[in-house]
C-alpha cells in the first residue's frame, strides 16, 4: 500500500480572488478522511495523522500581498495542513506579480536560496 509514504509535500497555488483555486479546495475536501488524514480522540478533539511531514507552499498572486488581510489562501492552506497533522510548513511567495514581475521573481528566488542553502 502507498499510504502516506511522502515525507515532503509541495503545493503550488495562485491566489484566485483572494482565496484558493477550486481544484485545491476540492483536493482538501477529498483528502480530509477520518482514519486517513485525521481522527477524533475519545474526548472529541481531532488529531491530524500526517505526522513528521514537511510541506512547501509556492504561492503566487497578481496583486494580492501574501499574508495581507486580503490573502485568504495562505492561512486557510496552513490550517488545512495542520488539520492533517503537518506542522512544518515553509512558504515561497511570488506575490504581486502584476505590479512588479521582476521583483517578485527575484524575491522568490532569494527565498528558495535561503530555504535550501547548506
Residue ranges of model-derived segments:
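Helix-loop-strand module that forms the ligand-binding subsite of alpha/beta enzymes
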Residues: 3-75
Amino acid at each position: 500500500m502507498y499510504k502516506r509514504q511522502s515525507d515532503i509535500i509541495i503545493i503550488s497555488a495562485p491566489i484566485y480572488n483572494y482565496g484558493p483555486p477550486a481544484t485545491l479546495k476540492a483536493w482538501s475536501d477529498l483528502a480530509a478522511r477520518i482514519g486517513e488524514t485525521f481522527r477524533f480522540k475519545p474526548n472529541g478533539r481531532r488529531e491530524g495523522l500526517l505526522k513528521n511531514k514537511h510541506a512547501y507552499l509556492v504561492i503566487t498572486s497578481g496583486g494580492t500581498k501574501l499574508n495581507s488581510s486580503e490573502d485568504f489562501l495562505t492561512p486557510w492552506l496552513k490550517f488545512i495542513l495542520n488539520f492533517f497533522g503537518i506542522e512544518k510548513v515553509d512558504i515561497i511567495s511570488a506575490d504581486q506579480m502584476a505590479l512588479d514581475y521582476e521583483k517578485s521573481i527575484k524575491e522568490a528566488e532569494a527565498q528558495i536560496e535561503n530555504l535550501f542553502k547548506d
